[in-house]
């Protein structure tokens, strides 16, 4: 079964459970959280028990009598509670039990939203809960992690842009059927999921327009979305915040040495492609996801991800900065012939950030270095990193 392929988050989550009383496993709808807990994680944790609050009776009990609900899971280690945000009252009860017994690995709370005040969750479990984000599947996860030894081809790359990494959709071979699944995902997100935030007055039509613009707009900022949709800027901001809380959008802030406002990217290249996004936008999303997975599940401190926009409105699509201050800049290029002037934006960025490593990702056949810029094939995003050979431009 394609869903059952191993996930890179597994070993990291198991480590968190060894040291933290509560762990939150969070991610957008259909990224594979439930299967991850029920099957992959349960194989590693023989004393675990899984329950979902999608069941109305369980949800009511968890909300109205949370200690009674948790008593049924007393022998589980961990107690895995899916869609935990649907019972805000549960969080106070978890805090109460954890404060009495702080053994690590007692609870795993799964959620398709942030656990925040927007969901009427007052108790943040600060100091008691570790967080693990589950992203769409990476290229290596889709191909069985270490099972695939063949080098990544251009055709593999193009296929991944279109199919994305949502486990229940990416393996559907028929393009029409896959498109229907993507459309179902968009409709469920905009017609149902956003209305979980009962304190907010959210509009299905505006949410649908926002997803389309986040795929197609050159700079999907709040101001641009408000201008195109002719919606109130505050209303647009509220919708963007809600979609970010649902992990549907990833927000990228501008690098402090550049210009511009925050942009919003869809979480998955397949969804972006379905909504009309360009190949470059799909690669930007894939690059961000691959880097997020690589850094989020390591023992190092998380990286900060931004973009760079010059005064001439040219874009470096991703800036990755480590806690140590090390910076990597990635510009995505869509032409097979790379000339010296094409490197100028990255070189200008380095003048402002002298320690930055510069990467130009282009549809070239092999990598090379020129004047401090590494020109690399698109496929480099998904492969084990090797030093490119040197060559003139």
Which residues does each PLM region occupy?
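A cross-kingdom feature that marks ATP-driven nucleic-acid transaction machinery
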Residues: 2-3, 15-18, 23-24, 28-30, ...
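Short glycine-rich substrate-engagement loop in P-loop NTPases that contacts/grips substrate
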Residues: 48-78
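Conserved catalytic/switch belt of AAA+ P-loop NTPases
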Residues: 91-113, 123
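Dynamic helix-loop-helix/coil hinge segments at AAA+ ATPase domain boundaries and subdomain interfaces
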Residues: 1-10
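Short regulatory helix/loop adjacent to the ATP-binding pocket of P-loop NTPases
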Residues: 115-130
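A short beta-strand-to-loop transition that corresponds to the Sensor-1 phosphate-sensing loop
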Residues: 110-114, 120, 136-137, 362-365
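Interdomain hinge/linker elements that couple catalytic modules in large macromolecular machines
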Residues: 135-136, 140-282, 297, 303
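Conserved P-loop NTPase "ATPase switch" module shared by AAA+ and STAND
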Residues: 74-90
């Amino acid at each position: 079964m394609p869903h059952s392929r191993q996930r890179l988050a597994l070993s990291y989550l198991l480590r968190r459970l060894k040291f933290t009383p509560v762990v939150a496993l969070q991610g957008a709808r259909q990224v594979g959280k439930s299967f991850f807990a029920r099957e992959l994680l349960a194989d590693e944790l023989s004393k675990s028990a899984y329950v979902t609050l999608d069941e109305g009776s369980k949800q009511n009990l968890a909300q109205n009598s949370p200690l009674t609900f948790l008593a049924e899971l007393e022998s589980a280690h961990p107690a895995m509670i899916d869609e935990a945000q649907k019972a805000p009252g549960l969080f106070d009860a978890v805090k109460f039990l954890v404060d009495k017994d702080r053994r690590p690995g007692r609870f795993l709370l799964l959620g398709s939203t942030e656990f925040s005040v927007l969901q009427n969750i007052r108790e943040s479990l600060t100091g008691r809960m570790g967080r693990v984000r589950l992203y769409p599947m990476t290229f290596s996860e889709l191909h069985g992690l270490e099972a695939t030894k063949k080098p990544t081809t251009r055709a593999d790359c193009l296929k991944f842009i279109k199919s994305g990494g949502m486990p229940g959709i990416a393996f559907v071979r028929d393009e029409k059927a896959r498109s229907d699944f993507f459309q179902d995902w968009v409709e469920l997100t905009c017609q149902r999921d956003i209305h979980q935030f009962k304190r907010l007055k959210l509009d299905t039509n505006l949410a649908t327009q926002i997803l389309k613009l986040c795929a197609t707009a050159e700079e999907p900022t709040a101001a641009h979305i408000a201008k195109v949709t002719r919606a109130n800027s505050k209303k647009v901001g509220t919708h963007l915040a809600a979609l970010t809380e649902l992990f549907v959008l990833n927000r990228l802030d501008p690098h402090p040495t550049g210009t511009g406002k925050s942009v919003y990217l869809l979480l998955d290249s397949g969804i972006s492609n379905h909504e009309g996004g360009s190949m470059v936008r799909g690669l930007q999303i894939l690059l961000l996801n691959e880097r997020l997975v690589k850094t989020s599940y390591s023992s190092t401190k998380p990286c900060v991800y931004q973009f760079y926009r010059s005064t001439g409105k040219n874009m470096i699509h991703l800036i990755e900065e480590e806690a140590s201050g090390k910076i990597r800049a990635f510009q995505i290029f869509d032409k097979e012939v790379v000339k010296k002037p094409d490197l100028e934006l990255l070189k200008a960025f380095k003048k402002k950030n002298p320690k930055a490593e510069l990467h130009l990702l282009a549809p070239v056949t092999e990598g090379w270095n020129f004047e401090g810029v590494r020109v690399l094939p698109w496929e480099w995003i998904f492969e084990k990193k090797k030093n490119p050979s040197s060559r003139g431009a």
